Amino acid sequence: GYVEHRPLPSHSFDAGAAWANLALQTTQAGWHAHAMAGFDRDLLRTRLGVPADYAIEAVVAIGRIGDKSLLPEALAQREIPSQRLPLEELVAEGKFAFGT
């Protein structure tokens, strides 16, 4: 039958929860999941035929971690942990206090 499409303001939260569970399950199974946000959404939408009314949040690669010594030098140099913000910049108590 007909299903009415309506905006779902919690879709990003739901996508994050789905990603977290996917990452946990792949780790449990001995695999590795790597989420990526830096990709060409328009190209992906075209190649996979994703309708315009669907949001593409991220892509995920699932596989086994390989031997880093086999990477080309340019890629090997990128294999370092990224900087993380201190918790004080991410967590607040009480009223919203960021950017004010």
Language model features by range: what are they?
Residues 1-100:
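Acidic, surface-exposed loops and disordered segments
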